[in-house]
Amino acid sequence: MKVTKDLVVSLAYQVRTEDGVLVDESPVSAPLDYLHGHGSLIAGLENALEGHEAGDSFDVRVNADEGYGSYDENLVQRVPKDVFMGVDELEVGMRFLADTDQGPVPVEITAVEDEHVVVDGNHMLAGQDLNFHVEVVAVREATEEELQHGHVHGEHDHHHEHGDGCCGGHGHDDHEHEHEHGKGGCGKSGGCGCH
């Protein structure tokens, strides 16, 4: 069965930056499952998978414009510390989900000042070309529920209410934050299966 829209694909992969640094991987023993054609992966990787089948293994270079986009200086902001109420100690490198008019946006603290914090809303791989080694582990039909929800439900998945955020995130009032539970990877917002 060839990878096409509305099929569930299980893939193992490694992704490296141009200088060879491994930034994420999912081994054959724990492949990433996603619903093809629903924007769960960065465009360049999803496009490269189209037409492949179980057992195929290949390398693909994904340019920044088909990955996490260009680095945008406008996504770096200086905000008052009190925006992070309830967080005892703010440190460089901490990640949060900021609630915005466009929905939750992952941000990373890049500087901590006396009264302010500098946050960067760019994905940590923004502006970088990426090299993937991919193995298609399996391809199957999606269930009706998976098609309705637009993502894969595995044996360890849980049912959710519509409106819940991805990776356990949920909405807050404007400018509130919560810790992000994902990490960088081939998904559109940092976690491999989340967007």
From Swiss-Prot:
Catalysed transformations (reactions): [protein]-peptidylproline (omega=180) = [protein]-peptidylproline (omega=0)
GO cellular component, one term: cytosol
Disulfide bond positions: none
GO molecular-function terms, A-Z: metal ion binding; peptidyl-prolyl cis-trans isomerase activity
First-level EC class: isomerase
Residues involved in Ni(2+) binding: C166, C167, C186, C192, C194
Cited SUPFAM superfamilies: FKBP-like
Annotated EC: 5.2.1.8
Compartments where found: Cytoplasm
Location of the PPIase FKBP-type domain: 6-95
One GO BP: protein refolding
IF-chaperone as annotated region, ranges: 76-120
Key words, A-Z: Chaperone, Cytoplasm, Isomerase, Metal-binding, Nickel, Rotamase
The UniProt record lists the keyword Cytoplasm: yes
Pfam families the record matches: FKBP_C
Function noted in UniProt: Folding helper with both chaperone and peptidyl-prolyl cis-trans isomerase (PPIase) activities. Chaperone activity prevents aggregation of unfolded or partially folded proteins and promotes their correct folding. PPIases catalyze the cis-trans isomerization of Xaa-Pro bonds of peptides, which accelerates slow steps of protein folding and thus shortens the lifetime of intermediates. Both strategies lower the concentration of intermediates and increase the productivity and yield of the folding reaction. Also involved in hydrogenase metallocenter assembly, probably by participating in the nickel insertion step. This function in hydrogenase biosynthesis requires chaperone activity and the presence of the metal-binding domain, but not PPIase activity.
Free-text comment on this protein's domains from its UniProt entry: The N-terminal region consists of two globular folded domains that contain prolyl isomerase and chaperone activities.
Stated name of the protein: FKBP-type peptidyl-prolyl cis-trans isomerase SlyD
Gene expressing this chain: slyD
